């Protein structure tokens, strides 16, 4: 796997709030995409640009058991 960009605050917020714009999981929040789908992108190639970076970061977060981080961010967004 290529070097994953270090998620910044805006990336983490986008992972929690942005929906997949196309494909099998169109309309699904990025944070809710199954690992198998993200792994498929890892094998086939992530989309270029911000979406690809977000998907790659989402996979890394899930693979490293850091999903609680996304839960906390989501709670903070809802609380505002």
Regions found by a protein language model. Name each.
Residues 1-80:
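DEDD superfamily 3′-5′ metal-dependent exonuclease/proofreading module
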């Amino acid at each position: 796997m290529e070097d994953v960009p270090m998620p910044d605050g805006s990336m983490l917020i986008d992972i929690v709030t942005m929906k997949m714009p196309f494909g099998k999981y169109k309309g699904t929040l990025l944070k809710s995409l199954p690992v198998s789908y993200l792994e498929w992108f890892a094998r086939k190639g992530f989309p270029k640009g911000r979406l690809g970076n977000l998907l790659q970061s989402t996979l890394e977060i899930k693979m490293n058991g850091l999903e609680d981080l996304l839960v906390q961010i989501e709670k903070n967004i809802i609380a505002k």
